[in-house]
Structures are given as C-alpha cells and as structure tokens.
From Swiss-Prot:
Purpose of the protein: Catalyzes the attachment of alanine to tRNA(Ala) in a two-step reaction: alanine is first activated by ATP to form Ala-AMP and then transferred to the acceptor end of tRNA(Ala). Also edits incorrectly charged Ser-tRNA(Ala) and Gly-tRNA(Ala) via its editing domain.
Domain text: Consists of three domains; the N-terminal catalytic domain, the editing domain and the C-terminal C-Ala domain. The editing domain removes incorrectly charged amino acids, while the C-Ala domain, along with tRNA(Ala), serves as a bridge to cooperatively bring together the editing and aminoacylation centers thus stimulating deacylation of misacylated tRNAs.
Organism: Coxiella burnetii (strain RSA 493 / Nine Mile phase I)
Catalytic activities: tRNA(Ala) + L-alanine + ATP = L-alanyl-tRNA(Ala) + AMP + diphosphate
Protein biosynthesis found in the keyword field: yes
Predominant subcellular localization, coarse grouping: cytoplasm
Cofactor info, note text: Binds 1 zinc ion per subunit.
Any GO CC annotation of this UniProt entry: cytosol
Gene3D superfamilies reported for this sequence: 2.40.30.130, 3.10.310.40, 3.30.54.20, 6.10.250.550, Bira Bifunctional Protein, Domain 2, Threonyl-trna Synthetase, Chain A, domain 2
Documented EC number(s): 6.1.1.7
Cofactors: Zn(2+)
Protein name per its UniProtKB record: Alanine--tRNA ligase
GO biological process terms, semicolon-separated: alanyl-tRNA aminoacylation; negative regulation of DNA-templated transcription
Length: 865
C-alpha cells in the first residue's frame, strides 16, 4: 500500500465512524507564540482541548504536516544518519473532544491496524502507563491481546502533558516488531533503545488537569488525541525497515540520482537532501522566507545544510531547487498548496542557493585550515561563531562537518560569542523599551484618534533620559504620557503621528509616537514654557495624518489588487505607511511584468474612482476569519480586532487609521517595484497630491526628452529605438575592430611566450586595450599554443584589469582562478571565474610588473606539488 493509499484509507475509516475530516493546518501555528512550528496533529485543536474554543463537531480526523527542526523538538542533526529522523513528517490522527474515550479509541486503533491494514497481531506490541489499569483491562480482557506482547511503562514514556500545568493524561502506544534480525528489545526493557520495535501509534487520554501544586484533578469532559507517523506506517506496510526506502523518499532519491548523476541511494548526503526538500518546500508554501531570525532562520539553516551535502557530492552549482518538481509530482495531489506555490518555492530556494554558494567555498577552506592546526579535536566556539557571522554557516552545519571528521563542538564558547554580539546590538534598541518601563508607573492611555485629531488630556507621566521627572522645561527633550490621546502610535506599518501639545503659556512638539502595552509615548521637544505632571493639555495631531490615512487605505486596495492580478497566494510580508509614500512587501516569486503592474495600478484607481465606503467593525478574530478578513501573517491578535471593509472589494484586519471613502485617496501611482528578499517583492507608491506631482514631473521629463531628440512624444519611442539600434551597430563595429587589433598583436605575443616545463606561459601587460579585448586575445592564444597558461593585464582609467586563461590539459595541475588569485592580491584587488577563464581587478599599478613576473615561478612550484 503506497502513501497516498494510506492517507485515503485512514481518512475514510474514521469518516465512516462519524469523524469530521479536518484539513491539516499550516506549519506556522496560529495565535501560539510558544511554538516555532506545528509539531503534532493536536496543535490546531489546542484551544478545543483547553476548553476556550468550541467546534461544531466532537470527533475529528486529520493528516497534519509537522516540523521538528529548531526549538525544543529538533531532529535536524540526526536527519540522514538514522532510519527514522526527519525534519518534516505527516501525522495521522483521530480526536475526541468529550465524546468517546479509552474503550473506543483503543478499539478503533486495533481494528484499523489488524482488520483494515491486515497487520498480524503477533507483530504488534502494546504499552500502557503503569497506573492506567482501565486501559490495561481494555487491552487484555476486551481486545484479548497476547499478554506476552504487552508492558507497563512509567511517566517518562507513557504520560503526556502539554506543559507543566493544564490538560494531561496517560497514553497507550502501539509498536511494530520488525523481527529478530534487528537488534533491540521490547518497550520497557533494558534493550528498548534498539530499532527492532518501532512506535507507530500513540493514543493520549486527556483526563486530568494538573494545577500549580502538581495535583491531578479529573476533567469534566475527558478527550482523546492520537498520532501515527505516516512514514513509519508506510515502512511497515511496504515491508521495509528504513523510512528512506518507502515510496515517498524513493521517488525523490531517484530524481536526485538523475540530477546528480550518482548511483548510491543510501548515501547519507542523498538522504539529507531529500528529507530537507520536503520541509523547505512546505515552509515556503506556508509563507516563510529565509532570514536571520525565527522561522526564517530555521528555513535558511535547512537549505544551507542541503546545499553543503550537495557540495559533498560534487555539486557546486544550484541544484536543490530542482527537487521541487518531483516533490510536487509526488505530494501535490494530497497538498494542493504545494502545487500552487511551486514557482515561489523554486525561486526562493534558487536565490538562497546562489547567495550561499558565494561564501560556502571560502568558509570550508577556512574551516579546513583551522581544523588542521587545532591542538585538540574540539572546534573552538569563536571559530564556530566566525563561520556563522561572516560566512553564514549555521552551527549545525559546522557540527555536521565536525561529526564527519570525529571532532566535537565547543558550544559553550559559541554561546558566549553570541551573547557578546547580542549585548552589543541590544544597546542600540533600549530607547523605547526603557521609556515604556519607566512610563508604566503612570497608568494607561485611552486612544481617541479614530474619531478625532484633537482632544483635551491630562499629563500622567514625564520622562527624560530614561528617568521619571515632574517637570519638563523649555528646549528640553523628553517623553510625555497622557491619559487620552488622538496621536496614533507606530504600529502595523503605519508611522507614529506628529503634532503638538498645547497648554497654558507653552507648547510641546511631538516628533514621534510609540506604544508599549497600553502606554502611548509622545516623544519630542518643549518649544516654550514648561510642563508638569497632572497639567492639562490640548493634543493636536498634524494634518499630515490625512496623507498617512490616504496611504494606509491605499495599501489595503493594493494588497487586494495584487491578489486578484497575481493570485491568492500573494501574502503581505511587511509595509511602511507614512505621509509622503507607502511601501508594501509581498510574497511573489519573480518581478512583475509591466502589464501586471499596469493592471494592479488600474484596479486600485478604479476602486478610488468608485468612492467605496470604508466601514469598520470590532469582532473576535474567529468572527473576522469567517467573514473572510485577511490577517497579517504571523501577527498575534487579542480577543477583539478591527475589521476594515472597503465596499465589497477589500476586507482586512487592521488597527490603523483610514479614509472614510476610497475617493479621498485621490490618485494612486506605483513608482517602483523591486526585490527585497528571496521570494519577496516590494512596491513603492504615492497617493493624492504626491502622485499628481510625480506624474507632472514625468510629463515634464517627457517634454524635455522630446525637445532634446527633436521629435514629438508620439514618435519618442520610435526615435529612441532608432538611436539604440544605431548604437548597437557601432558597438558591433567596435567589437570587430578590437578583434582585429587582438589578431594583429597575436604573433608579437607568441614570440614572448616562455616554456615552464611543457606549459607555454605568458604573463604580460598590454596598452590601449580593454578587458573584452584581453579576453579575446586570451581565447585566441589558448587555441594557438595548445597547452598554455596566460595572464594578460591592462590599466584602464587608473584601474588594473586582469584576465587569466588555462587550457584544459593544465587543469590537473591548477586552474585559472588559482593562477590569478595571487596576482590580484598583490595589486590590491580580487578575482574569480571559471576553471578555464578568470577575471580580476586591482588598485595598485606599481605592483603589477612584479606580480606578472612571478607567474612562471608560481607555475613551476605548482607542477612540483
């Protein structure tokens, strides 16, 4: 039975038992900052188990994609080296929320395994918690399993709890016995760590609530949470012991074999790569992008680990992204989002591969060099940190290399180096946090800025230089905290408001507004007079707020327009809303075409012209989702959210300030579209008068260009095309002249060739040529000389240009990049390229002649190595 059939069989079995088939949730847990990734089927039902959420069903069945890389549950360093560790796996699970309990859960599991899947009972082994006599009785007396294939285990193995307090309970586990040819004893025995008995299903019975004192109190409605790994079950059903031998992995391994032109499907690096493409693809499909923090950093680590293992197999060019296609072929039917996101996944992985490949070789050389000189077999923490900080080597990638060479890692030293860096970076980020900590003495601020731009208020706290003060004097800078304010605090991409606080005989200029918890911090400078705690003020927001409102409303229209033009997979990844402009970051695999940009811009302006009414409702996050409101990826929402609707065009959760009608935006103009990260595009745009000014400026430039080219605007494109075509013709003529010049110099250069053993060698400076001409001459010399190493140089506008060429029959001794590197270094520059052709540049012409003169000796030394 293949994996697709197993998924279908499992869902159908429990569907017939009145279970609601619930789609697996995202790998990114919703509203749960305690979890980095979804790591079990019960995660999406956590609030149901806790009693804070109700569902219209009491029985559920799901197939949940899960991650175990990063955080508490981290299998990354073992992946590829064992038969069953994976970064990504699928969890089959059935759940009861106060409906059936132990008897039915056990009966369903046993029936599915023995009657539906036809697994022989004599190959199964059952464990229960040592004090769970009810489950023991059900197994032995009702299911009548063989008592010799049954054991009791302690709390460590057979008692489950979500955290130190809360729902918990005993569990019963079902193991598959792979037979006596594999080492290991039954669960609960001293030999239980072997691989013979493999857990395939865990049934958790949540029947207690553990209080803060550790007491177990019975739950009013006991529940069931079960989990069974698809990969392990597939191994059992397909008669193999190693998960990498099942259909899912074999399909990917064979695709990788073709890609890398290798035959060893059991190679550890091959296994690492095919495991990692699954977790990487699903994470990107769920909206994660490579970065240097949080989930994005875990994704980056996994990609880089796969790339490094490809490098071990001799693959130095980007290859990992090409496994996306076979993965989609194998799993796209079960997970349509994977198929829908294929282009984004490929583009994101490829960009990350290219970026990392630039530093991988250098980092490996440094590590090789340092390891060769270490006095012990421990890699120092400062070296691990240097590789991480300078060359992007995640510590687990260095640990992989250490493991392969029988070295250990100095993690304590690495942690100290990391801590030093954190302390340095945190010093620059204490401003707002310190103010908020001091301001918390003063209470909270009521925000009234949705209804008005000015209000009366009382000063409840003043701060200066991180310290609470009672009085702020003229010309002094500080922070004012009010009991109520119309000033919007920086949040959700919208900048903080500016304006003034007016009071008797004085004023305070608010330059920025920030928020910490319920405290609004009005940051600025006293213009005149003095201000005391408990004084009354009139708070007035600057009229620039209207421009901010226009731009914020425009971002909502832009977001929806992008989804309609490019597809619903587009997700917001960030934004900046200020008075002068707006910036919007979104997930998309490639640059937008001019036609797509035009369609987006036109669609936004159509909604502005339609003058749609903006309405706001306050509701729970669950109600907002049912309404179809878009939520910002990764945002954690409170009990209530504001939902902004613009006609029937856009519905989003948003706490920002907006125009009452879309017509108030006036005009929308996209001024740039660019990439800001792998798989992330950025649009910058203007609205209102700023957009009109931009268009008028563009019109003026067109008029000036038309005058310059002596044509009207209607014929401007044709005129420019003709000029460019003439330019291309001239460039071709110039190239021919350069080629002719190269040919003319060829005979003279051949006469200056010296023989270093059997390698014809030339290292010389040429005058009045450019780099392209140097390349042409190198190519012709390689053809003429047979077995040759050539370095040509010229000085162009005060800067040295270098080109080196090596014929193929020299590559067993050295290549062009190796040949050119010391020369470039001597002239204060850098070089790079292919094995047969390298290029470089330098800044020290005075060292050039000596550097070229050293080439024959360098070659002679290489030949002796």
């Amino acid at each position: 039975m293949n994996s697709n059939q197993l998924r279908e069989t499992f869902l159908n079995y429990f569907k017939q038992l009145d279970h609601e088939v619930v789609p697996g949730s995202s790998l990114i847990p919703e509203n749960d900052p305690t979890l980095l990734f979804t790591n079990a089927g019960m995660v999406q039902f956590k609030d149901v188990f806790l009693g804070v959420e109700t569902r219209p069903y009491q029985r559920a069945v799901s197939i949940q994609p899960c991650m175990r890389a990063g955080g508490k549950h981290n299998d990354l360093e073992n992946v590829g080296y064992t038969a069953r560790h994976h970064t990504f796996f699928e969890m089959l699970g059935n759940f009861s929320f106060g409906d059936y309990f132990k008897r039915d859960a056990i009966k369903f599991a046993w029936d599915f395994l023995t009657n539906v899947l036809k697994l022989p009972p004599q190959r199964l082994w059952v464990t229960v918690f040592q004090d769970d006599f009810e489950s023991e009785s059900i197994w032995l007396k009702e299911m009548k399993i063989n008592p010799e294939r049954f054991s009791r285990c302690g709390e460590k193995d057979n008692f489950w709890q979500m955290r130190d307090t809360g729902p918990c309970g005993p569990c019963t586990e079902i193991f598959y016995d792979h037979g006596p040819t594999i080492s290991g004893g039954p669960p609960g025995s001293a030999e239980a760590d072997g691989d013979r008995y493999v857990e395939i299903w865990n049934l958790v019975f949540m029947q207690y609530n553990r209080d803060a004192k550790g007491n177990l109190l019975p739950l009013a409605k006991p529940s069931v949470d079960t989990g069974m790994g698809l990969e392990r079950l597939a191994a059992v059903m397909q008669g193999v012991h190693d998960n990498y031998d099942i259909d899912l992995f074999q399909y990917l391994l064979k695709a990788l074999r073709t890609l890398l032109k290798t035959e060893d499907l059991h190679n550890t690096s091959m296994r690492v790569i095919v495991d990692h493409i699954r977790s990487v693809a699903f994470l990107i499909a769920d909206g994660v992008i490579p970065s240097n923090e949080g989930r994005g950093y875990v994704l980056r680590r996994i990609i880089r680990r796969a790339v490094r293992h490809g490098y071990k197999l001799g693959q130095e060019e980007p290859f990992f992204y090409q496994l996306t296609k076979p993965l989609v072929e194998e799993m796209g039917g079960a997970y349509p989002l994977l198929r829908k996101s294929q282009a984004l996944i490929e583009q994101t992985i490829k960009q990350e591969e290219i970026q990392f490949s630039n530093t991988l070789t250098k980092g490996l050389k440094i590590l090789d060099h340092e390891m060769a000189g270490l006095p012990s077999r421990q890699i120092p923490g400062n070296l691990i940190f240097q590789l991480y900080d300078t060359y992007g080597f995640p510590p687990d990638l260095t640990a992989d290399i250490a493991r392969e060479r029988d070295f250990v890692m100095d993690y304590a030293g690495f942690d100290k180096a990391m801590e030093r860096q954190r302390e340095q970076s945190q010093q620059a980020h204490q401003f707002v946090a310190n103010y908020a900590q001091k301001a918390s003495i003063g209470g909270e601020t009521q925000f009234v800025g949705y209804e008005t731009l000015n209000s009366q208020a009382n000063v409840i706290s003043l701060l200066q230089n991180d310290q609470p003060i009672n009085r702020l004097n003229e010309s002094e800078k500080g922070v004012v905290v009010l009991d109520r304010t119309p000033f919007y605090a920086e949040s959700g991409g919208q900048v903080g408001d500016q304006g003034f606080l007016y009071f008797e005989k004085g004023s305070f200029r608010v330059k920025d507004t920030k928020k910490q918890g319920d405290i609004y911090l009005h940051i600025g400078e006293m213009l005149q007079g003095h201000l005391n705690v408990k004084d009354k003020v009139r708070a007035e927001v600057d009229v620039s707020r209207f421009d901010i409102m226009r731009n914020h409303s425009a971002t909502h229209l832009l977001h929806e327009a992008l989804r309609r033009v490019l597809g619903e997979r587009v997700m917001q990844k960030g934004s900046l809303v200020e008075a002068k402009r707006l910036r919007f970051d979104f997930s998309h695999a490639k640059p937008l075409t001019p036609e797509e940009l035009q369609a987006v811009e036109r669609l936004v302006n159509q909604q502005i012209q339609a003058n749609l009414l903006s309405t706001i409702e306050v509701m729970t996050p669950e109600e907002a989702k049912k309404k179809g409101a878009l939520a910002l990826f990764g945002e954690r929402y409170g009990k209530e959210v504001r939902v902004l609707e613009m006609g029937d065009f856009s519905t989003e959760i948003c706490g920002g300030t907006h125009t009452e009608r879309t017509g108030e935006i006036g005009l929308f103009k996209i001024v740039s579209e660019s990439g800001c990260a792998a798989g992330i595009r950025r649009i910058e745009a203007l609205t209102g008068k700023a957009a009109l000014d931009y268009i008028e400026s563009a019109e003026q430039q067109l008029r000036s260009l038309s005058d310059l080219l002596k044509t009207n605007r209607k014929n401007l494109a044709a005129k420019l095309s003709q000029i460019l075509e003439d330019h291309r013709k001239l460039e071709k003529e110039l190239a021919k002249l350069k080629q002719r010049l190269a040919s003319q110099q060829l005979e003279s250069l051949i006469n200056q060739v010296v023989d270093v053993h059997d390698i014809r060698t030339l290292a010389i400076r040429l005058e009045a040529v450019d780099r392209e001409t140097l390349r042409a001459i190198v190519d012709q010399l390689k053809q003429k000389l047979g077995k040759a190493a050539i370095v040509l140089a010229t000085i162009e506008e005060g800067r040295i240009q270098l080109v080196a060429g090596v014929t193929k029959n020299c590559l067993e001794h050295f290549n062009a990049t190796e040949l050119l590197a010391p020369i470039a270094e001597k002239v204060g520059g850098r070089s790079g390229g292919r094995p047969d052709l390298a290029q470089g540049a330098g800044e020290r012409p005075e060292n050039l002649e000596a550097a070229l003169a050293a080439v024959p000796k360098w070659i002679e030394k290489k030949l002796k190595e």
